[in-house]
């Protein structure tokens, strides 16, 4: 089952809009505006991620909400963990699409980290909130042994580390 939407607070909605609509290609389709139960009010913006209305990413622009003056919008920084721990991963249908996105990100002035994880291939950059954003395509299959190892890892730390990524590349922005 897929999720309907992921919602997060935004510090700079104009920058978020530029990133998610102009660079990622998600379409702003809806805003809900109204009071927040604890006080203040908010705009809740919804961006369509797929060609239909089944999957969205949403952002809250908060106004006069108590306790939200110095809002930390990076999920990882708010949790006190490294940037790559809490991240947003979107599906890429194939490697061609992934490469097109990588090129578009670079042309938009973004640095891109590309990783071949041996079973999936990913590109990463950061959004204006400071969140790590990933596009990923599954390139491998899962075996019974993969599942057994995953189940064992739930209850044991006495297991071998995974193989290192097949490749890791940093692609610098190519703004013209």
Model-derived features with residue positions:
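Vicinal oxygen chelate
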Residues: 2-11, 48-51, 69-176
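Core segments of cupin and vicinal oxygen chelate
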Residues: 9-62
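Short Gly/Pro-enriched turn/cap motifs at secondary-structure boundaries
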Residues: 35, 79, 113-114
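Short, acidic Gly/Pro/Ser/Thr-rich loop/turn segments
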Residues: 54, 66-67, 140-142
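A broadly used, surface-exposed interaction patch
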Residues: 59, 67-70
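Histidine- and/or cysteine-centered catalytic micro-motif in compact active-site loops
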Residues: 62-64, 93
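Hydrophobic pocket/interface hotspot
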Residues: 16, 20, 88, 105
């Amino acid at each position: 089952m897929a999720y309907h939407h992921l919602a997060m607070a935004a510090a700079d909605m104009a920058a978020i809009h530029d990133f998610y609509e102009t660079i990622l290609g998600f379409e702003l389709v809806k805003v809900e505006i109204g009071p927040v139960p604890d006080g203040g009010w908010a705009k809740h913006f919804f961006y369509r991620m797929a060609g239909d209305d089944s999957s969205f990413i949403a952002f809250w622009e908060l106004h006069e909400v108590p306790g939200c003056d110095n809002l930390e919008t990076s999920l990882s920084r708010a949790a006190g963990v490294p940037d790559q721990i809490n991240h947003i991963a979107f599906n890429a249908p194939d490697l061609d699409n992934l490469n097109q996105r990588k090129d578009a990100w670079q042309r938009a002035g973004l640095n891109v980290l590309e990783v071949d994880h041996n079973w999936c291939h990913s590109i990463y950059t950061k959004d204006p909130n400071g969140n790590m954003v990933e596009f990923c395509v599954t390139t491998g299959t899962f075996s019974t042994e993969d599942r057994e190892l995953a189940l064992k890892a739930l209850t044991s730390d006495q297991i071998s580390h995974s193989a290192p990524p097949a490749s890791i590349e940093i692609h610098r922005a190519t703004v013209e």
